């Protein structure tokens, strides 16, 4: 498949396939054959790196056809999947694999690595993946138009809002299609979400950290791009909003696994174990071996409840914060706010939504206090920028209400060991 992709892709651009390319391909095949040996686990990671390149190559060379882009994406994901997603897991120490608990010490019969917990993240990653691939197809010139039901572009531009956003100077500043990079990140999220057992919080710490990095910081970057759309570009992108919402909702479902892995590494360090080695190979932990798997032989309603509510719930005060944040983002329409005041309302509203949704995770409840300075900012901005009387009253009320709502923690139904002191 690797040979067929490279030959097809190069001929698609009208280029001759050099001999060195075939040498590289056959060497890669040799590595793939070596990876079949259980003693040569590193060869599987070499194959995974080849798969990563196959994911990126259509973006790096601006794939001229949709078939070339689809071929690279599909084969790249399959190469990575068959290299490192299948069992036995690569690089996990025997101590981590055969001893130790399923639940982190001190946690109340709840493992953040169970499939019920990962399923919402993987589902949302698929949503973002398909949206990003669709946007990439337009950026690569594979389709002539893109769906946009709500937002128009500039008056002197026949493009709609989505088309204008993804062909703007911000997007074109990247050397490759930025939507394609998003699709690649979502693909990696899907695959890292599938790696490892229900004990991967201690058997594969580096995978958990990589998974968290792809979701939390990159999710914040995605939200930042949404924030700048009306401020710098003057319009919106419906599909970008949906993808950003999918990324944002992933954050509360992913942070508890990061907390469990951080606690595990801290305990191993206190025990005098080699931290760097354990980070890559995992280790055992306090507690007895528990050979437990996810129980899918339940009522669908019970499974759905476990998927949605595992370590995550929506306190009424944080739900109201999300609504107020959305209301602030719409003051251009509701109060006719313009200029710097409209930009300030939009920026603060988006940050309030991000903070409140993140705090849906019980392990992140302390983070809600960041809403207080955002509320204080709302009490200042009406006196800095021009605003109507109605807009002034609205902003001041929103600021006071946000400060009051952020004081309540909300219920927490699980225990998180030493992290409980931060769930308040």
Indicate where each model-derived feature is located.
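Membrane-interfacial helix-loop segments of redox and metal-homeostasis proteins
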Residues: 7-32, 39-47, 53, 59-348, ...
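A domain-level signal for the structural core that forms small-molecule/cofactor-binding pockets
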Residues: 381-383
């Amino acid at each position: 498949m690797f040979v067929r992709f490279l030959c097809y892709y190069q001929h698609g651009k009208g280029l001759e396939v050099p001999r060195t390319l075939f040498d590289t391909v056959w060497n890669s095949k040799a590595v793939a054959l070596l990876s079949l040996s259980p003693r040569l686990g590193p060869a599987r990671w070499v194959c995974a790196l080849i798969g990563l390149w196959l994911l990126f190559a259509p973006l790096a060379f601006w794939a001229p056809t949709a078939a070339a882009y689809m071929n690279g994406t599909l084969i790249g994901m399959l190469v990575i999947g068959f290299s490192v997603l299948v069992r036995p897991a690569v690089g996990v120490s025997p101590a981590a694999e055969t001893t130790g608990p399923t639940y982190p010490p001190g946690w109340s019969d709840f493992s953040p690595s169970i499939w019920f917990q990962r399923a919402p993240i993987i589902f949302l990653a698929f949503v973002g993946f398909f949206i990003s691939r669709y946007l990439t197809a337009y950026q690569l010139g594979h389709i002539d138009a893109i769906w946009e039901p709500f937002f128009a572009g500039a008056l002197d531009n026949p493009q709609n809002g989505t088309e204008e956003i993804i062909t703007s100077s911000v997007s074109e500043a990247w050397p490759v299609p930025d939507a394609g990079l998003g699709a690649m990140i979502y693909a990696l999220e899907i695959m890292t979400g599938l790696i490892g057992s229900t004990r991967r919080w201690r058997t594969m710490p580096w995978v958990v950290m990589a998974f968290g990095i792809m979701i939390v910081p990159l999710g914040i970057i995605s939200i930042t791009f949404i924030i700048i759309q009306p401020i710098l570009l003057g319009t919106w992108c419906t599909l970008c909003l949906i993808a950003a919402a999918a990324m944002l909702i992933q954050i509360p479902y992913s942070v508890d696994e990061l907390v469990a892995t951080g606690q595990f590494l801290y305990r191993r360090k206190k025990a005098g174990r080699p931290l760097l080695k354990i980070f890559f190979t995992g280790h055992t932990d306090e507690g007895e071996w528990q050979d437990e798997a996810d129980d899918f032989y339940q009522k669908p309603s019970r499974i759905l409840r476990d998927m949605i509510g595992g370590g995550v719930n929506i306190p009424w005060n944080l739900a109201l914060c999300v609504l107020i944040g959305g209301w602030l983002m719409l003051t251009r329409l509701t109060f006719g706010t313009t200029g710097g005041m409209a930009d300030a309302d939009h920026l603060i509203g988006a940050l309030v939504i991000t903070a409140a949704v993140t705090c849906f995770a019980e392990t992140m409840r302390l983070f809600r206090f960041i809403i207080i300075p955002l509320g204080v900012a709302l009490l200042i901005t009406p006196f800095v920028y021009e605003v109507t009387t109605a807009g002034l009253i609205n902003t001041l009320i929103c600021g006071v209400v946000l400060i009051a709502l952020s004081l309540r923690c909300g219920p927490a139904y699980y225990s998180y060991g030493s992290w409980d002191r931060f769930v308040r």
